């Protein structure tokens, strides 16, 4: 597998020639599109398999108590397939660090890296558990819309992200597209079963979105201020950082979710769940394995965009996939009155415009970098 490299620091960019910068930017764009594809593929597979699981498990037809069980299992599945990434981590090449700079960073650097991964592992386990519960209480669109608002706020205060008009337009289009065009989910209760003034539902709405948005911004901060500063990969951002972070964070989250699974006694229900599965135990196991692998595909794409661009951009792409996923769910399942009507068609158009706006902002930024370097080259040649 080819190594992916993030954008160069500004000082290093100025030492390059325009042709070299153009080549690096081309590689960067390819990396961005590959990570975006992984998010779209992961989102689609996760939602299709989740719907398949809840339909086959008869949860919507069962009593309310059983409908809200199994959330620790879902949280564990979201993180447990990280070992599949370990071979890719060792296959990927990485730049050799300077031994002197690494030795100077070793003592303090490793402690900072460990603290980062433990903190992120706790956050990921929290939002994995609460999202599994939250989507059973409130609509998928409300969850993700709240999530994007919080990610925007955290990006401004934690990552010091500078908003331009194209990014703001992208956020507005994304919020509208996701709120009106989110995919149907078989586990969501009917409107007559929900209470809009239920405090528990609102708390379950706020806490997972808060944990997810905070984790995205801390991941970006971790790449920029911790992993790069330790200089284990030189001064560059490389794709191996994504796999390292995903493996370590998922390991911590898996441990926490496993403890939760056994402490809650939920593990006792696994045998009954497999026996109730309409398609049988084989399809039950295959659906869980497929879900676990799909979550890893999604997570690698998400972390890749955090590394290459920002946590906010990763969230916009993740949410921009919702209308596409909604179309796939309509085609694959028959949920009462669920259809891809004018509202979702408008949401799909809004998602396209949202992504186009953000991509245009990135294109303008990259074009400006080349123009500045060309101007610098011309000034040097005249001197």
Curated annotation (Swiss-Prot):
Keywords, comma-separated and alphabetical: Membrane, Transmembrane, Transmembrane helix, Transport
Subcellular location(s) per record: Membrane
Name of a matching Pfam family: PUNUT
Bilayer topology annotation: Multi-pass membrane protein
GO cellular component: membrane
GO molecular function, one term: purine nucleoside transmembrane transporter activity
Transmembrane segments: 30-50, 72-92, 113-133, 138-158, 166-186, 203-223, 247-267, 297-317, 322-342, 346-363
GO biological process: purine nucleobase transport
InterPro entries: PUP_plant (IPR030182)
Cross-referenced PANTHER family: OS09G0467300 PROTEIN-RELATED, PURINE PERMEASE 16-RELATED
Family: Belongs to the purine permeases (TC 2.A.7.14) family.
Protein name, UniProt field: Probable purine permease 16
Gene: PUP16
């Amino acid at each position: 597998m080819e190594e992916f490299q993030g954008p160069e620091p500004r000082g290093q960019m100025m030492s390059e020639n325009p042709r070299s910068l153009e080549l690096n930017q081309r590689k960067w764009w390819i990396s961005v599109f590959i990570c975006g594809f992984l998010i779209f593929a992961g989102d689609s597979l996760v939602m299709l398999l989740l719907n398949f699981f809840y339909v086959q498990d008869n949860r919507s037809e069962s009593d309310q108590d059983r409908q809200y069980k199994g959330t620790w299992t879902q949280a564990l599945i979201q993180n447990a397939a990280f070992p599949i990434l370990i071979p890719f981590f060792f296959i990927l090449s990485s730049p050799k660090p300077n031994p002197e700079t690494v030795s100077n960073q070793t003592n303090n650097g490793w402690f900072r890296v460990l603290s980062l991964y433990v903190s992120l592992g706790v956050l990921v386990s929290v939002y994995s558990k609460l999202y599994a519960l939250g989507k059973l209480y409130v609509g998928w669109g409300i969850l993700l819309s709240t999530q994007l608002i919080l990610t925007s706020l955290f990006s401004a205060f934690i990552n010091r992200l500078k908003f331009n008009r194209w990014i703001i337009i992208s956020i507005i289009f994304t919020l509208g597209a996701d709120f009106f065009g989110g995919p149907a989910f078989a586990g969501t209760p009917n409107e007559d079963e929900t209470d809009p003034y239920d405090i528990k539902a609102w708390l379950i709405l706020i806490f997972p979105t808060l944990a997810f948005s905070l984790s995205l911004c801390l991941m970006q901060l971790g790449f920029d201020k911790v992993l790069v500063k330790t200089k284990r990969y030189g001064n560059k951002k490389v794709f191996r950082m994504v796999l390292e972070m995903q493996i370590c964070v998922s390991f911590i989250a898996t441990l926490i979710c496993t403890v939760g699974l056994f402490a809650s006694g939920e593990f006792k229900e696994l045998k009954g769940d497999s026996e109730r599965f309409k398609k049988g135990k084989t399809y039950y196991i295959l659906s869980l394995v497929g879900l676990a692998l799909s979550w890893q595909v999604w997570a690698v794409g998400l972390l890749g965009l955090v590394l290459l661009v920002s946590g906010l951009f990763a969230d916009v792409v993740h949410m921009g996939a919702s209308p596409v996923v909604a179309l796939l769910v309509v085609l694959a399942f028959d949920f009462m009155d669920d259809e891809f009507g004018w509202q979702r068609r408008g949401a799909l158009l809004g998602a396209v415009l949202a992504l186009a706006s953000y991509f245009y902002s990135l294109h303008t930024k990259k074009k400006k970098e080349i123009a500045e370097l060309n101007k610098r080259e011309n000034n040097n040649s005249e001197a």
